[in-house]
């Protein structure tokens, strides 16, 4: 069987396909959000490469990578029609399950993933000294890069919020990304703590 070519030339004029075939501009908020998900996933992949001996953290980060891939796949589905159960932000969060009514053919409930991150954050925070001031990103290469991932994650959150102003975005996805940035921050602290690297703190000043 002949191998297909990687390039198609269909995007040479600045347009690309959504998962359902809809054509959108590569400069759209949709593509900005999906691209930032991919960027975060790649950065986390590089962080994983800096942690060859810590299988527990690597396993968790790879689980996060898979979740991000699933989120990106879900969001590439174009909402075909307005859902009467959605609120003004395009979401409907069940009080009992946290399940989002969105993209009927590709629903996923990320509430357990949020809970998993919250448990990780709480467990990790309990291991670390109390944080009494702001800290400078840095320390070990892995810790410094966890901060890079955190910053990209915050940018992803901003992209998703902007996108949600225009089209349905599951609210639980935004919650997940928000919590993920918190986890990446606490992970950066843990990585320095493991290697006994002191944190560099800065005083909060008014200028």
Q: Can you say where each PLM-predicted feature lies in the sequence?
A:
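Phosphate/pyrophosphate-binding loop motifs in nucleotide- or prenyl diphosphate-using proteins
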Residues: 1-207
């Amino acid at each position: 069987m002949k191998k297909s070519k990687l390039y198609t030339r269909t995007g040479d004029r600045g347009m690309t396909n959504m998962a359902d075939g809809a054509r959108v501009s590569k400069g759209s908020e949709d593509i900005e959000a999906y691209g930032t998900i991919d960027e975060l996933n790649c950065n986390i992949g590089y962080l994983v490469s800096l942690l060859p001996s810590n299988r527990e953290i690597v396993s968790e980060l790879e689980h996060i990578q898979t979740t991000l891939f699933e989120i990106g796949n879900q969001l590439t589905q174009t909402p075909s029609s307005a859902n009467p159960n959605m609120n003004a932000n395009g979401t409907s969060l069940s009080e009992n399950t946290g399940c989002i009514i969105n993209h009927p053919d590709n629903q996923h409930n990320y509430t357990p993933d949020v809970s998993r991150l919250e448990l990780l954050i709480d467990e990790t925070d309990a291991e670390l000294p109390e944080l009494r001031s702001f800290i400078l990103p840095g320390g070990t290469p892995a810790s410094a890069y966890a901060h890079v991932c955190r910053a990209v994650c915050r940018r992803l959150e901003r992209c998703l919020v902007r996108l949600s102003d225009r089209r349905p975005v599951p609210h639980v996805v935004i919650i997940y990304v928000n919590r993920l940035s918190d986890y990446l921050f606490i992970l950066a602290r843990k990585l320095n703590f493991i290697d006994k690297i002191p944190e560099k703190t800065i005083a909060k000043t008014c200028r």
